[in-house]
C-alpha cells in the first residue's frame, strides 16, 4: 500500500486529481506481484535458506519451507497463481506504456531468484529489488493516475530507490554466511563486511546531501525535504551497528536489519504526508478520498511499527538444541517479502 500510495500521492501533487478505480487496480497488481515474488523467492532460495545458520526476523526467508510447514511445490504453484492474477490485471491497464512497464516489473521480480537469470545470485539482486519495488512500482502507480509523471516524482523515486539498494545490502549482509555456502553471490557477499559498511555510509551521505541540494535548488518542497531528512537517524543507527559488530550477534542483528528496513517506509510515509500538507498550504488540497486513504495507510503503518518495535524488545529464549525462539511477530510490512 505504501509503495502504491507513494506514487499516487506524487501524481496527485502534480495534477490535483485522483482516480479510485485505477488506484484499486494498481493496488491489486502490487499485492499479486508481491505475493508472486514472495512465493517464488521461498522456492528458489530454499537451498540458501537451509544453509543459513543464523536467520534474523527480517532475513533468511520466512522459514516456512525450511521448517516443513509448506511444501516447495505449493509455494511454486502459489507463485504461478499470483503471476496469472498479475497478468490479468496488466491486461486491464489503459495504455501500452503502463502494460509494458507492468510486464517488465513482473519479469524482474520473477527472475530475482528464478533461473535462468537468478539476478540475486549474480550480485544484481540489490539493484533489481530497488528498481522493481521503489522505482517501477511508484512510476506505474503515477502513470495510472491523471497527474502522471513529474520531475518531483523522479527525484523522490530516486531517493527511495537508493535507500532500497542500501537496505538490500544489509539484508544480504545478514545472510552472507549461508549464501556463500551455496554459491549465492549477492553484492553484499561479493563486497564483504568492510566494504558493505563503507558503501552503506557513503550511500547514506550521498542520499541526504542530494536531498539538501534539491531543496536548496527549489526542486524539492521544503516540507518534503524535512520529512526525508528526519529519517536519517535510522540510517545512522544501522551504520553504528555495522561498525560495532552487531551483525555477529543475533539479537543485535535483528535490530540492525529492522531499522534498515524501517527507514524506507518511514521515508515513504513522511514524504506522502509532507506532499499533502504542501498542497493544503498552497490552497489546492488533494481530493478528500485520497487524503483519507493516504492518512489511513500512514496510521496503519504507525500502529504496525509500534507493535513490531514492542515485540522486538521481548527477550528471546534458547532451547536445549540451540534453537532460538522469537516472540510472535506481526504480518510483514511492504517490502519484507523481498528478503534475500
Stretches with model-predicted labels:
Residues 5-44, 96-110, 150-170:
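Membrane-embedded alpha-helical segments that form the functional core of polytopic membrane enzymes
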Residues 11-18, 128-182, 194-198, 205-208:
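Functional transmembrane core segments of multi-pass inner-membrane proteins
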Residues 37-42, 107-120, 168, 172, ...:
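C-terminal ends of transmembrane helices
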Residues 51-96, 185-228, 262-266:
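Multi-pass membrane catalytic core of lipid/isoprenoid biosynthesis enzymes
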Amino acid at each position: 500500500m505504501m509503495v502504491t500510495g507513494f506514487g499516487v500521492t506524487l501524481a496527485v501533487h502534480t495534477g490535483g486529481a485522483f482516480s479510485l478505480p485505477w488506484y484499486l487496480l494498481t493496488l491489486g497488481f502490487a499485492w499479486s506481484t508481491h505475493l508472486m515474488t514472495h512465493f517464488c523467492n521461498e522456492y528458489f532460495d530454499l537451498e540458501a535458506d537451509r544453509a543459513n545458520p543464523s536467520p534474523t526476523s527480517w532475513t533468511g526467508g520466512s522459514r516456512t519451507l525450511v521448517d516443513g510447514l509448506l511444501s516447495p511445490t505449493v509455494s511454486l504453484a502459489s507463485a504461478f497463481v499470483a503471476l496469472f492474477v498479475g497478468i490479468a490485471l496488466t491486461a486491464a491497464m489503459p495504455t501500452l506504456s503502463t502494460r509494458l512497464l507492468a510486464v517488465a516489473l513482473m519479469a524482474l521480480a520473477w527472475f530475482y531468484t528464478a533461473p535462468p537469470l537468478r539476478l540475486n545470485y549474480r550480485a544484481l539482486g540489490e539493484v533489481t529489488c530497488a528498481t522493481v519495488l521503489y522505482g517501477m512500482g511508484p512510476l506505474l502507480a503515477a502513470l495510472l493516475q491523471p497527474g502522471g509523471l513529474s520531475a518531483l516524482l523522479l527525484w523522490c523515486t530516486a531517493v527511495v530507490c537508493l535507500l532500497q539498494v542500501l537496505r538490500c545490502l544489509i539484508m544480504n549482509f545478514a545472510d552472507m554466511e549461508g549464501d556463500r555456502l551455496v554459491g549465492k553471490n549477492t553484492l553484499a557477499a561479493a563486497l564483504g563486511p568492510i566494504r558493505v559498511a563503507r558503501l552503506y555510509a557513503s550511500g547514506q551521505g550521498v542520499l541526504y546531501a542530494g536531498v539538501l541540494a534539491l531543496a536548496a535548488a527549489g526542486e524539492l518542497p521544503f516540507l518534503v525535504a524535512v520529512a526525508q531528512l528526519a529519517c536519517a537517524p535510522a540510517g545512522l543507527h544501522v551504520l553504528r551497528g555495522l561498525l560495532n559488530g552487531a551483525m555477529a550477534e543475533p539479537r543485535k542483528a535483528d535490530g540492525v536489519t529492522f531499522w534498515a528496513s524501517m527507514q524506507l517506509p518511514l521515508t515513504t510515509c513522511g514524504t506522502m504526508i509532507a506532499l499533502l500538507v504542501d498542497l493544503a498550504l498552497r490552497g489546492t488540497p488533494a481530493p478528500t478520498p485520497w487524503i483519507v486513504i493516504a492518512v489511513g495507510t500512514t496510521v496503519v503503518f504507525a500502529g504496525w511499527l509500534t507493535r513490531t518495535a514492542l515485540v522486538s524488545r521481548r527477550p528471546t529464549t534458547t532451547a536445549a538444541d540451540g534453537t532460538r525462539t522469537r516472540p510472535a511477530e506481526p504480518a510483514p510490512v511492504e517490502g519484507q517479502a523481498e528478503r534475500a
